[in-house]
Amino acid sequence: MTALGRCVLGHRRLRVVDLETGEQPATNETGDVVAVFNGELYDFGDVRRDLESRGHEVPGTGDTAVIPHVYEERGTDFPAALSGMFAIAVWDRERERLLLARDRIGKKPLHYVLLPGGGLAFASELKALFLVPGVRRELDPAALDAYLALQYVPGEDLGIGGIKRLAPGHVLDWEAGRVHTRPYWELLPTPRDLAEDDWLELVRESVTAAVRRRLVSDVPLGALLSGGIDSTIVVGLMAQEASEPVRTFTVGVDDPRYDEREHARVAARAFGTEHEELVVEPDPVELVSRLTTFLDEPLGDEAILPTFLISEVARRHVTVALTGDGGDESFAGYERYRAMGLARRIGRVPLVPGLAARGLRALPSGRHPRSTPARAARLLETAALPARERYGSLVQVFPAPLRDELYAPAFSASLGPARSASVLLGAPPAPGIAGLQRLDARAYLPDDLLVKADRASMATSLELRSPLLDHEVLEVGVSLPDSLRFAGSRGKVALRRAFGHLVPKELAERGKTGFGIPLGAWFRGPVRELAGDVLLGQRARSRGQLRTEVVERLLGEHARGERDHGHRLWCLLVLELWQRSWLEADLPAAAGYASQTR
């Protein structure tokens, strides 16, 4: 902790570069500009050389030290000069001015809350702000509704005690009790009239450069390898750059729908990596209880569990790991993107979507949500909706009618009608697949996928780096022509073709498996009793949020195999356990937990 007059800054460091001299806070030559920082800057060498050519004296050899000097040169626009993943606070002692900045994609979290009298408290971790006097640990009904619709709460307002997220690519400026935020970057396509070969070369160059930038480290470094095309490309490029075998790590489960060990072995053999596997056979009840110790906001993405487990294994050997996260967002790999186009075409034929969907719904209903009949029914139901509602219907967990049925009368009265997922997400910023990519980059990516990755990895002190989420890679991805996004049923066409020479043939055209766990089996087996005790118990009933008889019906339908509610039950279980752990439990004394300015 460092007291700087009206500002107090605190920091806890994971040492990755400049191990000996990279302590924080960092200052300029006079000590008038002070910075703390979470994350990594990948271009700090170039930035340092530029600053030194302008007469700045930058100490040490790492990235943090450049930040105060970049602020001196660029003022409030300083984040635009930096490339990496970061949450940064800069205190200008002379002006008594605080600047907060978050990286372009939202890889590193940054939360803040406005205090009475014009003060402000901020922190990387939400739980630090729970300790600030005056912050009420309460979940707004609208936030609960959004969570059940999407499995996460989208946007800047978390709906918890007035706490907000600083949006990705934004800077917050506090001075004399006044606050305003503004963007310093926006994900926009760059129209280019290029031949296919030129596009593919641009993809190769941007992805290769992104991987190369993320190999700078003064500690052991490896990669999380699934055998999917994204992580395989990342590991292949790492192997080309490395002088020693790359260390790779894979997690598997005894369910062929999720197990990717054999595919990962193919990639590991192809690139000569030093490979480690973990078969996930934990006590699910114990694992769920561990989740609540580090997940300080409600998140129903079950992939956080295997991410946590593989991070634990990797951290025994390395401090930094590269991942394949971002391939679907940057290069249009999600099936729902293609489904939107199909739904639009099907919807042009009157009556067909609704009739066909009802026919598919008449099939035995215990099928898995990812089964072909289930996906076909969702597609046809989507086609029958107005265009603006289609995308939300494909990504929702609890549809609005089911949420209306689920909510207790008093809670429902405080909320009003449940909002559709499309309303919660807002309209895509542009038509077509590029607009959907940008919509996901605005909501799902920073508020779900990156929350999952950051919380799970940081709980084990492992730093994850995602080259396919480099902002320059994303800019190329949203600029591609549709012919290089989808071809038939295959997505990520540009990525597949650009690196066809690198990916082993047996992996090049395989479909997406997903990084999940067998929730359906869990809620019919080892987690069934826990779920019943937690969701139907007195503590849950006393909240007055959900109708117990509807929750009981969902549990029963799932247990009998009539429906697969595994994902919905998981979201409900996480919500209740999160409220117990973070809204009800006693927390440590509040002194010194969050950085503050008054």
Predicted regions and their residues:
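Cysteine-centered catalytic environments shared across enzyme families
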Residues: 1-296, 307, 311, 500-501, ...
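Adenosyl-5′-phosphate
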Residues: 6, 130-131, 140, 161-168, ...
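Active-site adenylate/phosphate-handling loop in enzymes that bind or generate adenylated species
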Residues: 104, 309-367, 444, 449-473
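Glycine-rich loop motifs involved in handling phospho/adenylate chemistry
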Residues: 221-230, 255-256, 302-305, 330, ...
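Acceptor-substrate binding/catalytic loop of class I
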Residues: 297-301
